[in-house]
Amino acid sequence: MNTLQKGFTLIELMIVIAIVGILAAVALPAYQDYTARAQVSEAILLAEGQKSAVTEYYLNHGKWPENNTSAGVASPPSDIKGKYVKEVEVKNGVVTATMLSSGVNNEIKGKKLSLWARRENGSVKWFCGQPVTRTDDDTVADAKDGKEIDTKHLPSTCRDNFDAK
């Protein structure tokens, strides 16, 4: 006697569930990295908005601005903020963006990135990367304090070392 089979067998369903689980295991980390990179891009965008004011101050005064007020940008630094960015601070000509400690990807909570410039052949050349501090008009030093954004979350245009030239 022939019976008509309808639906899927238990083995077929288990195989499909296993495949979906494997795909999710691969896709989830990629999605997490994508969201972190998107959130970091907001920090870069806000920090880059301060470059022209810092450059103008340097070209007019021959030294880097000490803080947000002298650079002519919003002060206190917490006035420059975004959905994922806590503040953007100008300190001795280094523009540092700090991510929020909640509401952002876990891997970038409270982390920082910096934009800094050097005088080069009569113009000002900007760099972007991990947090730095300016030691004098021409030198910056690595400011590693455990608050660096993992390089994989930085765009390729923002991976300069503190000693970049």
From Swiss-Prot:
Glycans are attached at S70. The modification O-(sn-1-glycerophosphoryl)serine is found at S101. The modification N-methylphenylalanine is found at F8. The modification O-(2-cholinephosphoryl)serine is found at S75. Major component of the type IV pilus (T4P) that plays a role in cellular adherence, microcolony formation, resistance to neutrophil mediated killing, twitching motility as well as transformation. Mediates the attachment and the formation of bacterial microcolonies on host epithelial cells. Mechanistically, pili retractation induces host NF-kappa-B activation in infected cells, which is temporally associated with the formation of gonococcal microcolonies. The pili are polar flexible filaments of about 5.4 nanometers diameter and 2.5 micrometers average length; they consist of only a single polypeptide chain arranged in a helical configuration of five subunits per turn in the assembled pilus. Belongs to the N-Me-Phe pilin family. This is Type IV major pilin protein PilE1. It comes from Neisseria gonorrhoeae. The gene is pilE1.
